Amino acid sequence: MLIIGITGTLGAGKGTIVEFLTSQKGFVHYSVREFLKKKLLEIGLEANRDTLTMVANKLREANSASYVTDQLYEEALQSGSNCIIESIRTPGEIASLRKTGNFVLFAVDADPLIRYKRIYLRGSETDKISYEVFIANEAREMQSTN
């Protein structure tokens, strides 16, 4: 069993890689974002970039720096299939997954303006932001030390 972790900036193409690996290579997809959205629903909060970041940080503070991806890794193990864990964000998550011995990390990036245009076109509720907010959010997310 192989676990591929995908990290990268917003709108860089992580989803495109996931789509290829699931449709063409039979990988099973696990999403940090979807895991966090479920947690937000459980506590009655709307999913947006701020609440997703907030709940992720609270889970990490209450449990461990790698809590979210550890939970997804356990689900992946149960599947017995090659898996993708998408939207890995912190060094703690990467370090924990590397310890498994069956983990490869892909990092994806693209020019900020291209990425902003991509998120604007996909029209997700969490992506309805100005370019200035997009850049500010990205700078804030890059500051995480967990």
What is each residue range found by the language model?
Residues 1-4:
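Extreme N-terminal starter segment of soluble prokaryotic enzymes
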Residues 15:
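Walker A/P-loop
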Residues 26-28, 104:
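Conserved beta-strand segments of alpha/beta enzyme cores
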Residues 49-51, 96, 100-146:
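A glycine- and Lys/Arg-enriched "phosphate-lid" helix/loop adjacent to the NTP-binding pocket
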